[in-house]
Structures are given as structure tokens and as C-alpha cells.
């Protein structure tokens, strides 16, 4: 991790970017929308559009606006009440952005996504095509998770993750995560006066995640761990990430002019194909298979398929075609992919050569547990 005072922000050269705005930046301390703040973001994005940049906005704030409209002072804990607030608030959020962008002659579109939309390959491709069509038409897409219909089990999670998934979906050059923090520190600056600000690092650097997971670390406070993981996801499509304070004056336009603000996490990880991104990020894991050292070497260094002889344990229950994680002998995930046999059948054929599959199961659909075209190395 280094600081480079001569660097130019990656946003300056980006032609397509995703901007994620946290709820604290568009609401009055959680008490409904701050229309002036919404107008401010619209003005900055309009300026980026005049520079020829395509921008997709991922914006929080629907639940806070819904609570204000419903007269609720306390955030409900019941899922259906939260979903009701999101449904009411989404109307206000869209109206506010529509009015703000109209001041600059721009149209907006609402895109609500769920995990199931992105897990289904056809719906995933359709969402991708729709977003590309909107950008070609000069429309500013405003994306949020469809909180009204999702459950805890199928949530995408936080909007940092959603921002990264949308970044990969549209093959954006950069992801800008705007928050109420300056960026990343090597420890919590509120507790450690000697905390060092991290201006530049590599997305996916294990040191960042180690700091985030360490005891007493502030880097995970305020959702910074989710931002680090979002940057790692975005890097697999070649997108750089900037984590910056939305309190900075005209932060988006200054980034676009090349000024380095906040923490920049550069993409140096191997770029995955669109299909492998879909496999890694959009399909829910259904189980795990533990591999021996030889199988791990074959997957990671030789680009081979996973054979049953290399599996030493099966964890969880899954069916043919589900996404299953491959775990190395130390317990770390090394790959994931679409499995060709159910968990029950996999348990019967593990540690066996492929030539024995038909004898054990009565037939053989595939000689591999996972074909190399249907797996991605993590």
C-alpha cells in the first residue's frame, strides 16, 4: 500500500462508471430525503455526462424516505414493515431524482434488481441489455435492490455489493463508492491517533482484508469491509474502485478532472469473462467439496477440470447444476463452479477414478465433477 502524489484519478480516464451513494449522503440524518443533496448529485453526474461519460447511479435512501412519509420515527424490525417503507420511499426517491436530473435536461430510469434476477442467466443477460440500451439512449439508470420483494435468504446485501455487481454487469471502467468516511485507514482513526490513511492500494490485496478482520480494527467499522470486498469483485471485470467521502465538495467532478480523493483500489486481479463473473458473483453457493493438494494444483496451476478422485469430503446438500465451492486442505476456497453430480452421488464417487463412475452409479453423465469451462478460480 503506497501513497503516490503524482497519480491521476482513475475516474479521469473512465468512459463508463458506477457511482454508489450511501443513504447518509441523500437523507437528513435518516429523516427522509435531502432534496438539496439529491440535486447536488444530479448536477455532478450531469457534468460527467457532458464530458462524455456514461454513469449508472446506485442510490440508497428509499427506506428512510418511506419512514418519513409514513410518519415513523423508529426503524421497524419486522421485514414486511421495512419492505412497505421501501415501497413507499422508492416513489419519493425516484421523483426526487427525476426532478433533479430534469433540471439538466436528463431523463432517468428506475432499475430494481434481486439476487434471483442475476442468478438466472437469461434474466441476467436481459438486465445487462436493458442497462446498455438506457445508456445508449442517454438515460441515467438509477439502480437499487428490490427491497419490497426480497427476503433475507435471497438478498444481494448492501449497496456496496450491488454497486460492484452492476459494475461487472455493464463492464464499467470504475466504481466510485461515496460514503461519510474519508476512505480507508490501517486502523480506526477514532481510536488510534497514529492511524495511517491508505491513499492507494491494490484491490484484492489480502493485507486489506486482514486489517478489516483484525481485532480492534476500524477498517471494518462503518461498512469498510464490504467496500473492500466490493472493490475486489469489481476488479475481476477490470474496474478500479475509489472510496471517497461524499462530503467533499464536488467530489465526482473533481475525480473526473483527475484529482485523487479518498482511497483508490486499482484492479490488478485477473479479468474474468462475463460468464465466469456470473458464476462467481451471481449464483448462490449450495455446498462445498474439499479437495486434496493434487486437485488444487490441477485447478489453480494447470487449468484442468475437477475429477472425483481429487475430492476428499462433501459438505452440504446440492443438486446437479448447483454452484459448489472448492475448498483446499487448509479450509480456504480456491474455486467454485457448476457441479455435474448431486451431493449424494458425489459422496459415492469421491476418491474414485472417472472410469468407475458408471459402475458405482449405474451410468455416467460426465467424467468430471466440474468442467473447467464451468468453474472459476477464486
UniProtKB/Swiss-Prot annotation:
CDD domains per the UniProt record, alphabetical: AAK_G5K_ProB, PUA_G5K
Record GO cellular component, one term: cytosol
Gene3D superfamilies per UniProt: Acetylglutamate kinase-like (3.40.1160.10), PUA domain (2.30.130.10)
Residue ranges of every copy of the PUA domain listed in the record: 286-364
The keyword Signal is annotated on this UniProt entry: no
SUPFAM superfamilies noted in UniProt: Carbamate kinase-like, PUA domain-like
Localization (cell): Cytoplasm
InterPro entries, per the entry: AceGlu_kinase-like_sf, Asp/Glu/Uridylate_kinase, G5K_ProB, Glu/AcGlu_kinase, Glu_5kinase, Glu_5kinase/COase_Synthase, Glutamate_5-kinase_CS, PUA
Pathway(s) of this molecule: Amino-acid biosynthesis; L-proline biosynthesis; L-glutamate 5-semialdehyde from L-glutamate: step 1/2
The EC number(s) this enzyme carries: 2.7.2.11
Keywords for the protein's UniProt record, in alphabetical order: Amino-acid biosynthesis, ATP-binding, Cytoplasm, Kinase, Nucleotide-binding, Proline biosynthesis, Transferase
Pfam families: AA_kinase (PF00696), PUA (PF01472)
Domain of life where this protein originates: Bacteria
Residue positions binding ATP: 20, 179-180, 221-227
Residue numbers binding substrate: 60, 147, 159
Ranges that cross the membrane: none
GO biological process: L-proline biosynthetic process
Function: Catalyzes the transfer of a phosphate group to glutamate to form L-glutamate 5-phosphate.
Family as reported in the entry's similarity comment: Belongs to the glutamate 5-kinase family.
Listed name of the protein: Glutamate 5-kinase
Naturally occurring in which organism (per UniProt): Bordetella petrii (strain ATCC BAA-461 / DSM 12804 / CCUG 43448)
Taxon lineage: Bacteria, Pseudomonadati, Pseudomonadota, Betaproteobacteria, Burkholderiales
Amino acid at each position: 500500500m503506497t501513497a503516490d502524489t503524482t497519480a491521476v484519478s482513475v475516474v479521469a480516464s473512465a468512459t463508463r462508471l458506477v457511482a454508489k451513494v450511501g443513504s447518509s449522503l441523500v437523507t437528513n440524518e435518516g429523516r427522509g430525503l435531502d432534496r438539496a443533496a439529491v440535486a447536488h448529485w444530479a448536477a455532478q453526474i450531469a457534468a460527467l455526462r457532458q464530458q462524455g461519460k456514461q454513469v449508472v447511479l446506485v442510490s440508497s435512501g428509499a427506506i428512510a424516505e418511506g419512514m418519513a412519509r409514513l410518519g415513523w420515527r423508529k426503524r421497524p424490525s419486522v421485514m414486511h414493515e421495512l419492505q412497505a417503507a421501501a415501497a413507499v420511499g422508492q416513489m419519493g426517491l425516484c421523483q426526487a431524482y427525476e426532478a433533479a436530473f430534469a433540471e439538466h435536461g436528463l431523463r432517468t430510469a428506475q432499475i430494481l434488481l434481486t439476487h434471483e434476477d442475476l442468478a438466472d442467466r437469461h434474466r441476467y443477460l436481459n438486465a445487462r441489455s436493458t442497462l446498455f440500451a438506457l445508456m445508449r439512449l442517454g438515460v441515467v439508470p438509477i439502480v437499487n435492490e428490490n427491497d419490497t420483494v426480497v427476503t433475507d435468504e435471497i438478498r444481494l446485501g448492501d449497496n456496496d455489493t450491488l454497486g460492484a455487481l452492476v459494475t461487472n454487469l455493464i463492464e464499467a471502467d470504475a466504481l466510485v463508492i461515496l460514503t461519510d468516511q474519508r476512505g480507508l485507514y490501517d486502523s480506526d482513526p477514532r481510536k488510534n491517533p497514529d492511524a495511517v490513511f491508505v491513499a492507494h492500494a491494490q484491490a484484492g490485496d489480502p493485507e486489506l482484508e486482514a486489517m478489516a478482520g483484525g481485532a480492534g480494527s476500524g477498517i471494518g467499522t462503518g461498512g469498510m469491509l464490504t467496500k473492500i470486498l466490493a472493490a475486489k469483485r469489481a476488479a475481476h471485470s477490470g474496474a478500479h474502485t475509489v472510496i471517497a467521502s461524499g462530503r467533499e465538495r464536488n467530489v465526482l467532478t473533481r475525480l473526473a478532472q483527475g484529482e485523487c480523493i479518498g482511497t483508490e483500489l486499482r484492479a490488478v486481479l485477473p479479468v474474468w469473462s462475463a460468464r465466469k463473473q456470473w458464476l462467481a458473483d451471481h449464483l448462490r453457493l449450495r455446498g462445498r467439496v474439499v479437495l486434496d493438494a493434487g486437485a488444487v494444483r490441477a485447478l489453480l496451476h494447470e487449468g484442468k477440470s475437477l475429477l472425483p478422485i481429487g475430492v476428499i469430503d462433501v459438505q452440504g446438500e446440492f443438486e446437479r447444476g448447483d454452484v459448489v465451492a472448492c475448498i483446499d486442505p487448509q479450509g480456504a476456497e480456491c474455486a467454485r463452479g457448476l457441479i455435474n453430480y448431486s451431493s449424494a452421488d458425489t459422496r459415492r464417487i469421491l476418491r474414485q477414478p472417472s472410469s468407475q463412475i458408471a459402475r458405482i452409479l449405474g451410468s455416467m453423465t460426465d467424467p468430471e465433477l466440474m468442467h473447467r469451462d464451468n468453474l472459476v478460480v477464486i
